[in-house]
Swiss-Prot record:
Keywords for the protein's UniProt record, in alphabetical order: Amidation, Cleavage on pair of basic residues, Hormone, Neuropeptide, Neurotransmitter, Secreted, Signal
Signal peptide: 1-24
Subcellular location as annotated: Secreted
Domain of life the protein comes from: Eukaryota
Species annotation: Eurydice pulchra
A Gene Ontology term for the protein's cellular component: synapse
InterPro entries assigned: Pigment_DH (IPR009396)
Protein name: Pigment-dispersing hormone peptides
Length: 83
């Protein structure tokens, strides 16, 4: 799935660059095209680093895990209450 998304984004960027028939230089892009390329590059980098995760589907921590991580409670102590 990850490689399919990267492939689609790569093809989109390549087709945008090659749409004039030859490789365009950066001075040939309008401001809106530069913003589109920058946002696509940002998405590619995010997907390459952590895989495709739709916005809002990030893993959630339970309240106890969040409190323990904020307080710095050692894992041994937090596991003791579960036994």
């Amino acid at each position: 799935m990850r490689f399919i998304i990267l492939g689609v984004l790569f093809i989109a960027v390549a087709s945008m660059i090659l749409s004039n028939g030859v490789m365009a230089q950066s001075r040939d892009f309008s401001i809106s095209e530069r913003e589109i390329v920058a946002s696509l590059a940002k998405q590619l980098l995010r997907v390459a680093r952590m895989g495709y995760v739709p916005e809002g589907d990030l893993p959630r921590k339970r309240n106890a895990e969040l409190i323990n991580s904020l307080l710095g409670v050692p894992r041994v102590m937090s596991d003791a209450g579960r036994r």
